[in-house]
Amino acid sequence: MRSFLLASLASLSVISVYGHPHARSTLTRRGVDLDSYRMKHAATYKNVAEVVADHNINTLAKRASAQDIATDLVKATIPNATFRLVSDSYVSDNGVAHFYFKQTANGLDIDTADFNVNIGRDGNVFSFGNSFYKGDVPAPPSLTKRDGSEPVAALKSAVDVLALPVSAQSATAEPKDATETYAIKKTTGTVSEPEARLVYLVDDEGKLALTWRVETDIMSNWLLSYVDVKDGSKVHAVVDYSADATYNVYPWGINDPTEGERQLVTDGFYPPASEFGWHNDGKMAFKTTRGNNGIAHTNWDNKMSGFLDLPRPTSEDLNFDYPFSLNQTDFHDYGNASITQLFYTSNKYHDLLYTLGFNEKAGNFEINNNGAGGVGQDFVYLNAQDGERFNNANFATPPDGSPARMRMYIWNQTTPFRDCSFEAGVVIHEYTHGLSNRLTGGPANSGCLSMLESGGMGEGWSDFFATAIRLKPSDTRAKDYTMGEWISGSEFGIRNYKYSTNLEVNPQVYTDVDQYTRVHPIGNIWASMLYEVLWNLIDKYGKNDDWLPEFNSAGVPKDGKYLAMKLALDGMALQPCNPTFVSARDAIIDADKALTGGANLCEIWSGFAKRGLGEKAVYSTGGRTNSFDVPAGVCNNSTVSSQARRVKLPLSV
């Protein structure tokens, strides 16, 4: 296990960590109040105005590198301190370079003593903060490698004092390469091996205490417990990398405000998909709407760059609870609520798509791929209330390795105006553009839905996934859905036809594509076909109304809804660059063959054939040809006649 280096500067909204936190504390249920073990010593911060006014800082000699300037500032500020440069220094998009230093004493880290220096574009000190210790340093302890009994005893003390669900009766300690650091073996109840490291800590009296920093990941909490070396029964402090994030949002499954009320929901991430949680990228833990999968903010001024500096809410306890009323007339007043909703919905969808196969290797959107393949460095910039225009939303998908951008606009077709971040279907629609563009033609090629027909199918996949996700437990194939009804203020929504299996409600067939020269009406036809396939599969396998699918031992979703979504997703990865309806249909059929051995060919073919994309359908630039036929032998050794397209199909097809 890699060691952790805390950087608990009160002036910063991030904490440097390595590894992944998990959510939801259980220690309170065991009678342990972790808040009583919080660190007591805050850092100081010198802002840019104070730096400019400080003559001593301005007289620091110009050096060859920003790192040298930062180092000189630390030396000048705390002349007698010993320290080391932490390896996570970087330059922000705004041109400010950030350097982090850890104070040491007698060759050991002082875990609560940090110094951060920010160097501006001009090479001068911009601002800085520090919590360096200024008192007397005790005599050095013996730093010879121990026999392992002390770190094991420290772990047992932490387990006893904090009532941790860990068994360490047979534990042994093995030295690691880092100074006075031990891996503790033969324990149970932890996600990974505990680690003990000898460090100093500033105690409640303001003096240096020599402690064992014991790291234990027990899933519900990821703890650093500082156990006194002399008095093993004393735990000076505890740091918990985990945090229960709370969001006041329309929960997953509520498509828009007409379907339910906002609620306070806690966390909600799926650890295999978001192994660092939603507010951590494996190196930094964020106290704002930022994490490995995305960063959400308002963009009222339509800025085209500098997204990291845009306004977003900050909460030390990750409690994102902001007021919102449907009667509010000024959308600026509920910007934080909009950001929170957008961040929540996008992260939920990221995790769902991961379970269906849109992972790191497939080109999903994450900053840190954590060794799982793909390029990384490409979360999604989530622009709430984007000021470019009204009545729209869009998603820009560059190749794998470059961040995507979602722009959600205010809609002015109602009074008061409406914010599309509060309609989950719109958020999911936009995010699905990232899915279809990354999968079609491979993650490195984002230009594979650039034809009119393939671009239209991109719109269709987005509508389809949004509609499938909003299905309710009581829904049957008789249920019709409108896309964008709430945001537009129109019962007809923003598409030509509702999504329906009733040909009287939605009569569209393949050749109707001929009349359109824009992608959205073409997408309406493609999604209508997928909606037919969806209900054929639901009628066969039932519908899972939970947030995530259940899979059988072969990796096949057990229900029809998630199976339809899985096949659509797998088909994207199989289909060629710039597919047609015909080739995309074939790819979905191939996806079923690959996943299930072709167990659902009748349901899939029947869904497409009902709307003219049967066996003999033809794509041509001069005009498309309908076919309402299912291949012979696919459905009970018979064909579905073209006459069947105007009547309800039997449940068996």
Swiss-Prot record:
GO terms for cellular component: extracellular region. Its EC number is 3.4.24.-. The active site is at 430. Pfam families: FTP, Peptidase_M36. CDD domains: M36. Disulfide bonds: none annotated. Glycans are attached at residues 327, 336, 412, 636-637. PROSITE patterns: ZINC_PROTEASE. Its cofactor is Zn(2+). Residues 20-244 form a propeptide. It comes from the Eukaryota. GO terms for molecular function: metalloendopeptidase activity; zinc ion binding. It is found in: Secreted. Zn(2+) binds at residues 429, 433. One of its GO terms (biological process) is proteolysis. Secreted metalloproteinase that allows assimilation of proteinaceous substrates. PANTHER family: EXTRACELLULAR METALLOPROTEINASE MEP. This is Extracellular metalloproteinase. The gene is MEP.
